[in-house]
Swiss-Prot record:
Biological function: Required for the polymorphic O-glycosylation of the serine-rich repeat protein PsrP. A stabilizing protein that is part of the accessory SecA2/SecY2 system specifically required to export serine-rich repeat cell wall proteins encoded upstream in the same operon. The GtfA-GtfB complex adds GlcNAc from UDP-GlcNAc to PsrP, attaching the first sugar residue. Stabilizes the glycosylation activity of GtfA. Has no N-acetylglucosaminyl transferase activity on its own.
UniProt gene name: gtfB
Other facts: Encoded in RD10, a pathogenicity island with an atypical GC content that is associated with invasive pneumococcal disease. Pathogenicity islands account for greater than half the genomic diversity observed between isolates. The main function of this island seems to be correct synthesis and export of pneumococcal serine-rich repeat protein PsrP.
Record organism: Streptococcus pneumoniae serotype 4 (strain ATCC BAA-334 / TIGR4)
Subunit architecture: Interacts with glycosyltransferase GtfA; probably forms a heterotetramer with 2 subunits each of GtfA and GtfB. Part of the accessory SecA2/SecY2 protein translocation apparatus.
Name of the molecule in the record: UDP-N-acetylglucosamine--peptide N-acetylglucosaminyltransferase stabilizing protein GtfB
Comment, domains: The N-terminus of the protein, including the glycosyltransferase 1 domain (residues 1-171), is required but not sufficient for full formation of the stable GtfA-GtfB complex; the complex of GtfA with truncated GtfB has intermediate N-acetylglucosaminyl transferase activity.
Keywords, sorted A to Z: Cell membrane, Membrane
Region annotated Glycosyltransferase 1, chain positions: 55-171
Membrane topology: Peripheral membrane protein
InterPro entries, per database record: GtfB (IPR014268)
Amino acid sequence: MIELYDSYSQESRDLHESLGATGLSQLGVVIDADGFLPDGLLSPFTYYLGYEDGKPLYFNQVPVSDFWEILGDNQSACIEDVTQERAVIHYADGMQARLVKQVDWKDLEGRVRQVDHYNRFGACFATTTYSADSEPIMTVYQDVNGQQVLLENHVTGDILLTLPGQSMRYFANKVEFITFFLQDLEIDTSQLIFNTLATPFLVSFHHPDKSGSDVLVWQEPLYDAIPGNMQLILESDNVRTKKIIIPNKATYERALELTDEKYHDQFVHLGYHYQFKRDNFLRRDALILTNSDQIEQVEAIAGALPDVTFRIAAVTEMSSKLLDMLCYPNVALYQNASPQKIQELYQLSDIYLDINHSNELLQAVRQAFEHNLLILGFNQTVHNRLYIAPDHLFESSEVAALVETIKLALSDVDQMRQALGKQGQHANYVDLVRYQETMQTVLGG
């Protein structure tokens, strides 16, 4: 079985890691030219480039013109010519420390005209040029020797591939190129599993071997109607896709409501087998990550739980308002916290409070979920409801209820296990045995 993703999103990662735990997957393919894919995943746009050695580029190592200056912090960086911004540096996703993934170069009017794409080996492996209207025109991919290997025309959609000692190959679109790539790998493509109805579905639909048996994993909401391509899967006997897995229970039930009963056996509800990084140790230690000094009811919560240590971390300097929290003996502050320090704090804490206003910092709720922290918050501040059980979200006026929930969870192992069970169930967690058995049934194994 081959996994096929448009991009390595959080949803793709959850599916990939769940399948990896079962041992059922042969290979994962990501169409997006992502230079920071983890080991075990391939992109057709980077596969032929030959990069295998090197370290990621640190933000201040980006080549710039004389007298231009690189300015950056833990969140972003830019390149300036005196006072004019000439480029924006994008970091690799996740908890990585200022590692360069993309540089957007601007003209004197501030429009992006060129984007340099970097990989985890510190190389600029591709360059995209843009029109005056900021529309992508062309992406050129170069190999480890600096030779042009791939050229993608974003206007016409065609792709040119030039391999050493071979004639140039022309592909009219991504579907043709990806189909060639899968054939070139000389692997069994009789079963594809994919998670969007865009390019991956079209690869399945146009695959020359019509005898295959593919699976769609639908990870998006459903509203008033079934998408057209999903309807095609349900109604046609001539498509390779035979089953539709829906991880979210509410979305699965909505799919049944929107379709005729005769199609219901094509839908399967199956969540994810998440890869938790550690156990919860029932420690009286709570973590808050924030980009703001507006933390809802933090004084009241800290005062009501004097035996709980509250660790508040920010990647910037803290305001005097936050620094005043040091008057509470059970509060510890971490300003200008590095990604490494934040990872340490996740290891120290067993509760996460999603109570900061403004933006979420470094996918904090998801990170807390992966570290098996019990997550609680307020409806007025919640950043990611997917990983927080509904019983653990409160109105900002319900401080007493939140405090009592924390006390109950910390009272004994069974109470914490029950609270974490609600959290996992809400996030569609499935134990490995059930996940493996269900997936094998879907795949026909």
